[in-house]
Amino acid sequence: MMAKPNGKIQFKNLQSHGVLADPDFPKRTWKLLKTAMRQIHQQNASNLSFEELYRNGYNMVLQKHGDLLYNNLKKMVDKHLKAVAKTVSESIDEKFLLELNSSWINHKTSMLMIRDILMYMDRNYVKQNNLSSVFDLGLYLFRDNVAHCSTIKDRLLNTLLSMVQKEREGEVIDRILIKNIVQMLIDLGVNSKNVYIEDFEKPLLLKTSSHYQAQSQTLIQTCSCPDYMKKVEICLKEELERVSHYLDSSSEPKLKEVCEKQLISNHMRTLIDMENSGLISMLKDDKIEDLKRMYNLFSRVSDGLNLMKDVISSYVKEIGRGIVMDEEKTKESGTYFQSLLDLKDKYDNLLQNALYNDKQFIHSIQQAFEYFINLNPKSPEYISLFIDEKLKKGLKGVSEEEVDIILDKILMLFRLIQEKDVFEKYYKQHLAKRLLLGRSISDDAERNMIAKLKTECGYQFTSKLEGMFTDMRLSQDTMSGFKTYIQNLKKALPIDLNVHVLTTGFWPTQNTANCNLPREILLCCEAFKSYYLSNHNGRLLLWQTNMGTAEIKANFPSKSHELQVSSYQMVILLLFNDQSKLTFKEIADQTGIPTIDLKRNLLALTNPKNKILDRELPSTTSSTTTTTTTATSSSTSTSPSSSSSSISTPTPSKSIDESDVFAFNTKFKSKLFRVKVMAVVQKETPVEEKETRDKVDEDRKHQIEASIVRIMKARKTLEHSNLVSEVIKQLQSRFVPNPVIVKKRIESLIEREYLERSKQDRKIYNYMA
């Protein structure tokens, strides 16, 4: 409803005078009022006495002539507005709206004056008879006689729509004039906006829809996706400006809906699928601004973000699947996992800078990563290997803050691994090597990683890892006591022995065949065993020669070197103090080293980088020379030895064959005095993979059974499907149990009388205390 002027004519000390019954009073008084109202309509009211006019109107109502006054007013204004409508209709071109606006302003002003004159009638007669007020009556009459005049109504609509269209096409229009006309339509609805809605808003929305339908079809065929979106942004901005300048605010959501439907909703799929510029192209080329623009536009319409989210998720799955199934990338665990980290960084950046960290996109992309990272059964091993590489040398020279960031990134992908128990197996193996070989770049970094795993998976997950650190600390104390013990005996050992005492349950120990250690080594081992068992009665020591290292002195013709080798390599090299050359079988028989481990260590010793041994075919002949090797220390056991040995010339080979013959490399040279010769790191053999998997499966059986018992102990009675669901829910932080395996473990527990089937329903289990 229009805002009515605050100014009113004030009548002070007005008194009612007795009026004698006069049959001509109504007619005479109306004539006087009518003349005054005509002058008001003609904008010639300066000489009128409004106090006298008010008194006449007051007396008319007082003398019960309110109906006459009201009806005559209606007729007079009606007649006047018909003349106004004729004048407006006759105006041409651009003068049409100006004339209409002028007539409207004059009419409002006139009706305000007339309202003040007939104020008493408004407050009494009109209110008592539930009629429209004087001013509202004027609005209704203007609506019916002018705005809805047959020669004005359609012309008014067409003129307004034409002006809006011209502005859309870039022309400058009189926004203030349109605003006044729009306000007129709003005012003519009195207490509603029906006139504005029916006469202008609805046709405007239809016109807007057809305009942008045509424009969008043209743009979608001629523009790239980014260019189209930029033009859409401009269109939407201009439409909002239109609302603020001359439309009613209630039109904004309706206008937005129409524009967004034609410009966005109807073309979402086309925009996404545009070749070389659509959503996939933006993702490939990291078009952050374009992706952000698409998010902003698609967020305006129903299902826009869902469509965008699904396409991104499918694309991420496709790219991730390509990485985890790429044979070249999976050959190197570092390359494999770094590719996944790079992909994660890329989409974390996209989420933050283009998608406003929208939770539904975060969840969708995370699900995509979880999908493809678990396609490769080796992912748990590769994550552990990647961490192993970082904690050995990849974090060297990096600040604590940067280390924390890198470990957190790794942990983000670790969370997505379903087989966390498999990861734990490999992590224990790799951590054991780092600790025993002293390869960790930082004890703090190791503990930081374990703390993060503990936060992520709980104490049970890391308790054995923490136990490994405890063993390392206690071993230092044990060795300190052992050295004091030897000193007190006043009998020096032939080598500097360092032993790590490992708790079987914590470390990934193996039931390997005992290696045939030299006599001097065995002497040292027995001395340590005697000391240890005297302090820890009832314990059993099993030597893990495969996990040890040694430092031995090797005398080559050119110079002497200190070799850092594994315990197996030490045992192999010491054989050449007594023999000139040895076949693979002879080395195997004399050392007792398992074939797989023997091949790995011989491959390391014949590696061109640090070629300590030569290989030759059985028929090859060679000259000989003499060298001496002396063992100086070992993590588990070592033995000194000194004697001559004949060695053969080298024969290149990339793999160890059981027919190979080995000899000491007299031509070995190195700029370094201390030469590190460690076993060649190879991927697990199929047999080793099966052993690891069997261990994991066996552990899972126990964990599933423990979970079943815990649940049934608490619930007492439970239906099969509910029990399986609860077991999966309880264990999914470590691995996702196969329902078939869960069923087998339930049956095993029934056989062992932990559970029983209900007699009423065999699908229901009861806990047996």
From Swiss-Prot:
One of its GO terms (molecular function) is ubiquitin protein ligase binding. GO terms for cellular component: Cul3-RING ubiquitin ligase complex; nucleus. Residues 618-653 have a biased composition (Low complexity). Residues 699-761 form the Cullin neddylation domain. Its main location: nucleus. Keywords: Isopeptide bond, Nucleus, Ubl conjugation, Ubl conjugation pathway. Residues 614-655 are annotated as: Disordered. There is a cross-link at residue 713 (Glycyl lysine isopeptide (Lys-Gly) (interchain with G-Cter in NEDD8)). GO terms for biological process: protein ubiquitination; ubiquitin-dependent protein catabolic process. It comes from the Eukaryota. Pfam families: Cullin, Cullin_Nedd8. PROSITE patterns: CULLIN_1 (PS01256), CULLIN_2 (PS50069). Gene3D superfamilies: Cullin Repeats, Cullin, Chain C, Domain 2, Winged helix-like DNA-binding domain superfamily/Winged helix DNA-binding domain. PANTHER family: CULLIN. Belongs to the cullin family. This is Cullin-3. It comes from Dictyostelium discoideum (Social amoeba).
